[in-house]
Amino acid sequence: MANEDTANMLKECNAGVKMGVDSIADVLGDVNDTKLKEILTNNKEEHQKIGSELHEILNKMDLAGKEPNPMAKTMSWLKTNIMMTAMGDDSTVADLITDGCNMGVKSLSRYLNQYKEAEPFAKDLTRRLIDLEHQLTIDVRPYL
């Protein structure tokens, strides 16, 4: 059985991956630029791979996954739909994705600090997610 910090960190990463996948899926249909669509699709697939890895680890540890915070999910959905209705271009998509990734990096970094006793593999997985989200902010900058 994993220590409590490991379990909590993995659950938070699981919720974060779900939020990331859903957020990218919410905007993919509105993307016009082929390269931006490719960037987002590839990143979504990477999030899904990490999500599958997390799911497998959580199952082996006999732990349930965690859903994203309903309020955060609702606020994200509202912001996305309002902004896409108002402006609805690739720049808006890049802006929304950048904001979402920055929030993800901030939350994941907080979990690294909060769950100090988490096992190294859980910390490494969290860092991989941070790197993935940070890289996406870099990749979408030309579209801002």
Question: Language model features by range: what are they?
Answer:
Residues 1-7, 61, 84:
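Membrane-interacting alpha-helical segments
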Residues 2-31, 92-116:
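Alpha-helical bundle segments that constitute or directly flank the non-heme di-iron/ferroxidase center
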Residues 5-13, 34-49, 90-96, 121-132:
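Alpha-helical scaffold segments that form or flank carboxylate-/histidine-based iron centers
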Residues 21, 51, 55-58, 79-82, ...:
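A structural signal for well-ordered alpha-helices, especially hydrophobic packing surfaces
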Residues 25, 29-36, 59, 63, ...:
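Short, flexible helix-adjacent loops and helix caps
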Residues 37-71, 140-143:
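Conserved alpha-helical segments that form or flank metal/cofactor-binding pockets of metalloenzymes
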Residues 56-105:
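Carboxylate-rich helix-loop segments that flank metal/cofactor sites and access channels
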